[in-house]
Amino acid sequence: MSQQGGSFSAQTKEELLHTVPAHDGCIRAEMAAVIQACGSLVLTQRGLHLELISDHPALVRRMFGYCKKMTGQSAQLLVRQNKRLNRRNSYILRLIGRETVLGLLSQLGIWEDGMVQGTPRGLERTCCRRSYIRGLFLCCGSVTNPEKAYHLEWTLKEESLCQDLLALLEKEEISAHAVEFLEGVKEKMLMWPISKKAMAWRRCWR
């Protein structure tokens, strides 16, 4: 599960958030991953809009910049205060407008036949594939300090997304496996622990 604060996971994510995508294809791949992992389509009286929710403000700001670049429109940025003890605030990016939202999803290669698809098109390039893996990690990944105990994982809600990630990691020659578990009473989630040679994970997002 993702950790923030001063943890090694948090430090790793801060480092990754300063990664400059090689080209627009890498931007599309990273953004597609973020939308699939922590985004949702919401239908209201105002129409269709896209919401991204994260407890990492820098990630939301990064996606705000990507949205502006790809759609020419500014998304809304909101903060939701969590009143539970020791819970971080949630940061929300909201892109409004059916035409804008579906146009963006189409550009990202994850909208087809009226629904959000799995792995986006265009991940044949190594840099784009690694950008997609990086986006998933920024949303729902965690890693321990390899100098202490090596462990890297992604916590994902969709089995299809998990299978896609396994296939992408295999292309990176990183061995992984799936572990299914229950969180609370209702929510069923999936987790991918990885044990490999120390620092091998760095190939995933460079």
What are these regions (language model features)?
Residues 1-51, 55-59, 77-89, 98, ...:
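Sequence-level preference for short, compositionally simple segments enriched
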Residues 54, 60-61, 65-206:
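DNA-contacting interfaces and partner/effector-binding or oligomerization modules
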